[in-house]
From Swiss-Prot:
Primary role: Catalyzes the attachment of glutamate to tRNA(Glu) in a two-step reaction: glutamate is first activated by ATP to form Glu-AMP and then transferred to the acceptor end of tRNA(Glu).
Catalytic activity as recorded in UniProt: tRNA(Glu) + L-glutamate + ATP = L-glutamyl-tRNA(Glu) + AMP + diphosphate
Protein species of origin: Nitrosopumilus maritimus (strain SCM1)
Protein name, UniProt field: Glutamate--tRNA ligase
Originating gene: gltX
SUPFAM superfamilies, per the entry: Nucleotidylyl transferase, Ribosomal protein L25-like
Length: 569
C-alpha cells in the first residue's frame, strides 16, 4: 500500500483516538478514508487489514503518547479548527415581525416528558428567540381522566433541566369560562349542536358520511340540551359537535366534538367543571386569545389545521400561522405511554427514569447533557420527513459536551489479580484529564493490583505491559493470578497499555449498561447489562450525577456511591 495512504490513515487514527479518550475503531477510520479517498471504495478489503493494524497500534498508545506523536508528525491535526458559523436548520417564518412573534408549547400533563416533547419545546422556544418575541408554556389540562399533578410537575422539571425559559406560564383550564362562552356562541349561531346519539352510531355515521337527527334540531332545543349537560346528562350521553361537513374527505371535519362531559376531579380546579373542551376546540381558542402568531406541532396534527381554522372563522377570531414538523423517536426506544406503561407494570423496565428509555428523566440519568439534546434537535431542522434516529446520533453531540470536563478514572471488569515486585513508590500521581487542566489525583499502591480479565487474556509470560500512569511491568508468571516485576524507565512503544486498580483501596460498584430496548417490534430481553467492577476510591469523592470517563471503557455517570451508568463510548 502507498506510504502516503498509510501516513494519512495513521494521522486520522491518532486524531480520532485523541479526541475520544485514547481509543478509535476500524469502521470509523475506514469511513473517514473512504470519504477523502473515494478511489479506495473498490479496494475495501485491501485497506481494511492495514487500517486494523494501524488502529490496534494507536489504541495501544496512552493519550500522552498519542499527543506527542501528533505534535512531532502531524501538528496540523492538533491545530485549532477554523470555526464555521452553522445555521441550525430553522427557516425564516412567514409574516413574522421582529419583536411581535408569539409561540407556545402546550404539553398535556398525562405522562412523563420525552425527547419528542423536547423537540417541540426547543423549536418553539428558538423561534421566539430568533424574532425577539414571546414564548408561552401552556399546560393543556382539559382531560381530568388522564392528567395528574405528578406529570405536570415532571414536565416543568424536565423543561427547566433543558434550560428552556418562558415569558408566560398558564394552564388551559384557566380559561374554562371562555370555552363555555364560545361554545354557547357557536350553538346560538347554528354552527354547533348538542348530539345525544350513542357513540357507536356517531362513529358509523361519520364513516358513512351521514348527518344524524340531532344536527337538525333548532337552537332552542340545543340550548336546553346544553343546560342538561351541566347536571343531568351522564358522560357519553351528550356532546357538543361542530357543524363541519359530513361529506368532507378530511374525516376531522365530519362534525367533530367540541365539548364533552367528564365526571372526574381535576388536579387543580377540582370538581368545579364537568364539561370539558376537546383538544381541537381548546387549542384553537387558546392560541387565538393568547396572541400566538405561529403555532408549531408535530405533523400528526396536520389534518386538524383545517378544523382549527374553521372554528376560529366561525367565531370571527384571529388565526395564527400553523407549522408542522416530524415526530422525533429513536430506533428501538419507544416514546408511547401505551408501550412504556405495560413494560413498567411487568417489571421489564424499572420506571420512567430507566436509562433505556427516551424520557427526559432517563436521558438525564444516563448522562445526556441538555445542551447536546438542543444541538441535536436543531441539527434536524424543521422537516416533516419521518425522524427515526439512531441513538448514536445524539451520542455524537453529547460526546462534545462531556469530554472536556469528564475526569478520567481507572476501572476494571472481570477482575484478575496481579502482584508486582520491585515497585519504586507507594503513591503514584495521575492526571485527571489527558489534555485539560483538571488537576491530578494521588493513588496509594501496594504490590497487589486488579487488571481487567479481558486484558489478562492477551498477556503472555515474559512479555512486558505498561500500567497507565505507573510504568512497565514484565510478566513473570501466568496462572489464577499474574506476577510481574516493575521495570524502571522501560520503553513503552508497541506494548500493551492497560488500566489498573489497587486491590487495597479498590471500590466495587455495579456498572449499568443500557442497550436498545426493542429489536423491530420485539422486546430485547438483553437490553440491560449489569457488571460488577472495581474502580478507584476517588469515585467516592465525586458528586452524584457527575460525568466521568473510565479509561478504555467509555463515558459514564455516577448514579450513586455503588452504581454507575454507562453513557456511551
Amino acid at each position: 500500500m502507498d506510504e502516503e495512504i498509510k501516513h494519512e490513515i495513521r494521522k486520522m487514527a491518532l486524531q480520532n483516538a485523541f479526541e475520544h479518550g485514547g481509543q478509535t475503531q476500524d469502521k470509523i477510520i475506514l469511513g473517514k478514508i473512504l470519504g477523502t479517498k473515494p478511489e479506495f471504495r473498490t479496494k475495501v478489503k485491501e485497506i481494511s487489514g492495514e487500517i486494523s493494524e494501524i488502529v490496534a497500534s494507536v489504541n495501544q498508545l496512552s493519550p500522552e503518547e498519542q499527543q506527542k506523536e501528533m505534535e512531532e508528525k502531524f501538528p496540523e491535526a492538533l491545530a485549532p479548527k477554523e470555526k464555521i458559523e452553522e445555521r441550525e436548520g430553522l427557516p425564516e417564518l412567514k409574516d413574522a415581525i421582529q419583536g411581535k412573534v408569539v409561540t407556545r408549547f402546550p404539553p398535556e400533563p398525562n405522562g412523563y416528558p420525552h425527547i419528542g416533547h423536547a423537540k417541540a419545546a426547543i423549536i418553539n422556544s428558538e423561534y421566539a428567540k430568533m424574532y425577539g418575541g414571546k414564548f408561552i408554556l401552556r399546560m393543556d389540562d382539559t382531560n381530568p381522566e388522564a392528567e395528574r399533578m405528578e406529570y405536570h410537575a415532571a414536565i416543568k422539571v424536565g423543561l427547566e433541566w433543558l434550560g428552556i425559559e418562558f415569558d408566560q406560564v398558564k394552564s388551559t383550564s384557566d380559561d374554562m369560562e371562555v370555552f363555555y362562552e364560545k361554545g354557547i356562541e357557536l350553538i346560538n349561531s347554528g354552527k354547533a349542536y348538542v348530539c345525544t346519539c350513542k357513540r357507536e352510531d356517531i362513529s358509523q355515521n361519520r364513516r358513512e358520511r351521514k348527518a344524524c337527527k340531532c344536527s337538525m334540531e333548532d337552537v332552542g332545543k340545543n340550548n336546553k340540551n346544553w343546560e342538561k349537560m351541566q347536571n343531568k346528562f351522564k358522560p357519553g350521553e351528550a356532546i357538543v359537535r361542530f357543524r363541519g361537513d359530513m361529506k368532507a374527505d378530511n374525516a376531522v371535519m365530519r362534525d367533530p366534538v367540541l365539548l364533552r362531559i367528564i365526571d372526574e376531579k381535576h388536579y387543580t380546579v377540582g370538581d368545579k367543571y364537568r364539561i370539558w373542551p376537546s383538544y381541537d376546540f381548546a387549542v384553537a381558542i387558546e392560541d387565538s386569545i393568547d396572541g400566538v402568531t405561529h403555532a408549531f406541532r408535530s405533523k400528526e396534527f396536520e389534518l386538524r389545521k383545517e378544523l382549527i381554522d374553521a372554528i376560529l372563522d366561525a367565531l370571527g377570531m384571529r388565526k395564527p400561522q400553523q407549522g408542522f414538523f416530524s415526530r422525533l423517536e429513536f430506533k428501538g426506544m419507544p416514546i408511547s405511554k401505551r408501550i412504556i406503561k405495560p413494560l413498567i407494570e411487568e417489571g421489564k423496565v424499572s420506571w420512567y427514569d430507566d436509562p433505556r428509555l427516551p424520557t427526559l428523566e432517563a436521558l438525564r440519568r444516563r448522562g445526556i447533557k441538555p445542551e447536546a439534546i438542543r444541538k441535536f434537535i436543531m441539527s434536524l431542522g424543521l422537516t416533516k420527513a419521518n425522524t427515526l434516529a439512531p441513538f448514536d446520533a445524539l451520542e455524537a453531540f453529547n460526546r462534545k459536551f462531556v469530554d472536556a470536563d469528564s475526569m478520567r478514572l481507572f476501572m476494571v471488569k472481570n477482575a484478575k489479580k496481579l502482584k508486582i515486585k520491585n515497585l519504586q513508590s507507594t503513591i503514584v500521581e495521575v492526571p485527571n484529564h489527558p489534555i485539560n487542566d483538571l488537576g491530578k489525583r494521588k493513588i496509594e499502591i501496594t504490590e497487589d493490583f486488579y487488571i481487567s480479565g479481558d486484558d489478562s487474556e492477551a498477556i503472555k509470560e515474559q512479555s512486558t505491559i505498561r500500567l497507565l500512569g505507573l510504568g512497565n511491568v514484565k510478566i513473570t508468571k501466568i496462572g489464577n493470578e499474574l506476577e510481574g516485576e516493575f521495570e524502571r524507565d522501560g520503553d513503552s512503544s508497541n506494548i500493551l497499555k492497560i488500566q489498573w486498580v489497587p486491590q487495597k483501596t479498590a471500590h466495587e460498584i455495579k456498572m449499568i449498561i443500557p442497550k436498545i430496548l426493542f429489536n423491530d417490534e420485539e422486546f430485547n430481553e438483553d437490553s440491560l447489562e449489569e457488571l460488577d467492577v472495581y474502580t478507584e476510591p476517588q469515585y467516592l469523592q465525586l458528586k452524584e450525577g457527575e460525568e466521568i470517563q473510565f479509561v478504555r471503557f467509555g463515558y459514564c455517570r455516577k448514579d450513586s456511591q455503588n452504581q454507575a451508568i454507562f453513557t456511551h463510548k
